[in-house]
Each structure stands twice: as structure tokens, then as C-alpha cells.
Amino acid sequence: MNLISIPALADNYIWLLHNDDRRCLVVDPGDATPVLQALADHRLTPVAVLLTHHHQDHVGGVSELLQHFPVPVYGPEETRSKGATQIVNEGDSLTLLDHTFSIMALPGHTLGHIGFYSAPWLFCGDTVFSAGSGRLFEGTPRQMYESFQKVNQLSSATLICAAHEYTLSNLNFAAALLPQDSVITDYQRKIKELRLKNQPSMPTKLHLERQINLFLRCHDVNLQNKLNVHPAPSEEWRVFAALREKKDHF
């Protein structure tokens, strides 16, 4: 299987996952035009569309795409009015292109947000970004923290296929908060160079995110000290909440 990232809109990524028979899955098509172009360029034929949540920059291209390729559209209940024809929930599984995808409930960015996981790929929409977290438009910090914990239980080799190119701005925030963290600052320099060449920073591996993503480090004493939040281990979501609020105003 081969993974293709399609830059779209301002800073979105639409994902194509295809096999050797040139059949593919399309994930979160916020705009049909670049998808249709990529399908033509790579001589691919979609067999399904996967939607992680209902926001327009993830579903805006569904209708036009279906005019060209009338395929099933899998998504959470909140995407039913956005073109989803097959509603999927936590615990469901899909077999597509001979791979089984597990559905993960990942509330936070939206209440019905889901992820599609088939090792090594996790299509997680606007939940986990490289070095960052999605904004909380509908859910609570605790919900998003728990979604991050769920993702963190996956294999360290998991490829995080997030839907936006926010990596450098996330690293700028992390480096401002923990300037002595050389893993973060070294990666910040690497991504600056990458983005100057207009190359994508996605997908990212979970083992790297465990080092550079502060939202996966709520147990970190240095981070807790910086935020002046010292919760009991059972309430580490409070660190996540303080971190998310600080990022919102960065």
C-alpha cells in the first residue's frame, strides 16, 4: 500500500491510500479539484471515501467527487448530512483494499470525531497534529486528553496522518514553552528547512510525537512546572487543558 498526501485549501492534507491495483481510499476530501487531479496523475480509482468529522474543509469535496466516482462514504453520525452513506462508530471495523480499519472515537475537536486505524496508518483528522492538538470547537479538554491517551496506546510505529500542515507553528509554541528541550528545538530547525522547500511534514510517527508533542507529555514535570499545574496522576487532563488554553493565545 502507498500513501499520498494532497495539499488542499489553505493548509489541509487530503490522503490517498492505494494498492498495486491502482485502487484507493480518499480521506477527508475538503476540495474535489486537487483530488481529481491526483487521481488522474496517479491513474487511481477510488473505492471508498472516509470522513473523520463534519467540518467543511474535510467534507466540501464529497459531492463533486461522488459525481465522478459513486462510491460508499464512511463517516460518523455527524457527517450524515455531509454525504456519508455508511455511518460507523467506535468498535466498528471496515475491510477495504484487503486491510481492516478499526474505528476509534476521538471526541474533542468535534463531539463525533473519529479516526480510522489500520496498522501502521491512523487517519485522525483534526485530533493529533505533529507537535500539537486540534482546537476544541465542541468537546472538552478532558475529552481531547482521553482521545490522545487512546492514540498513545497504539504502536510506536503508527503513522499519524493528520489533516493540516501546522507542524512548524506547533513547534514554535513548544520551543517557546520549553526552550531547553533539544529534541524539540532540533526538530524545529529540521521542519523549518523542510517547509522552505515546500515539503510536507506529514505523516509523522507516534514514537516521535511522544517526544515533541507536549500534548502527549502531560506527565512531564518540567511541563507541569512551566504551566504551574501539578495535578494528581488521575487528573493529568488539567495539564492538557492549561496547555491548550496557552496555545490558543500563542
From Swiss-Prot:
What this protein is called in its record is Hydroxyacylglutathione hydrolase
Quaternary structure note: Monomer.
What NCBIfam families does this protein map onto? GSH_gloB (TIGR03413)
EC numbers, comma separated? 3.1.2.6
> Which pathway does the protein contribute to?
Secondary metabolite metabolism; methylglyoxal degradation; (R)-lactate from methylglyoxal: step 2/2
What is the cofactor note? Answer: Binds 2 Zn(2+) ions per subunit.
Gene name? gloB
Cofactor(s) annotated in UniProt: Zn(2+)
SUPFAM superfamilies (UniProt xref)? Metallo-hydrolase/oxidoreductase
What family does the entry list? Belongs to the metallo-beta-lactamase superfamily. Glyoxalase II family.
Q: Return the PANTHER family for the record.
A: HYDROXYACYLGLUTATHIONE HYDROLASE (PTHR43705), HYDROXYACYLGLUTATHIONE HYDROLASE GLOB (PTHR43705:SF1)
Provenance organism: Sodalis glossinidius (strain morsitans)
